[in-house]
Design a protein with these regions (language model features):
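Positively charged n-region of N-terminal signal peptides that target proteins for export
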Residues: 1-6
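C-terminal segment of classical bacterial N-terminal signal peptides
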Residues: 13-21
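Beta-strand-rich domain onsets/edges
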Residues: 20-38, 43, 61, 100-105
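A short beta-turn/strand-edge loop motif at beta-sheet boundaries
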Residues: 46-50
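Short beta-strand/loop motifs in extracellular/secreted proteins, especially
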Residues: 51-53, 85
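Short amphipathic beta-strand segments in non-cytosolic proteins
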Residues: 54-67
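Glycine-centered loop-to-beta-strand initiation motif
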Residues: 69-78
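Short, aromatic- and glycine-rich surface loops/edge beta-strands on solvent-exposed regions
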Residues: 83-97
């Protein structure tokens, strides 16, 4: 019986380490302010702060138009480029998300 309890305890510990609940995804929402600017709010699915995360605005050919970092509220307001563009939340490997300019919430 003690061996069974030991095996179950070890299995539970190993299962907890491999749990997908420990993972988190990058989130980015961008809103058109209707004044020539847009605001993006970033974060992680587990509620972690995104303060200081790099935001990159690129045109349709990949040329960087603007770069900024999320403030202490995990937000940034930028000038809206003319033409097609995208906004990249650059949280590092596996933690990046991109929003197309034509999908900004108005």
């Amino acid at each position: 019986m003690k061996n069974l309890l030991f095996i179950l305890a070890v299995a539970a510990l190993l299962g907890a380490q491999a749990s997908p609940a420990a993972a988190h995804s990058a989130l980015l929402n961008c809103f058109d302010n209707a004044d020539g600017t847009f605001t993006c709010q970033g974060g992680y699915s587990d509620g972690s702060s995104a303060t200081g995360i790099r935001i990159v605005v690129r045109d349709s050919s990949g040329i960087v138009l603007q770069e900024a970092r999320l403030d202490s509220n995990s937000e940034v307001t930028l000038n809206r480029p003319q033409g097609d563009f995208s906004v990249l939340f650059d949280g590092g490997a596996g933690h990046s998300v991109e929003v197309r300019g034509d999908s900004l919430v108005r």
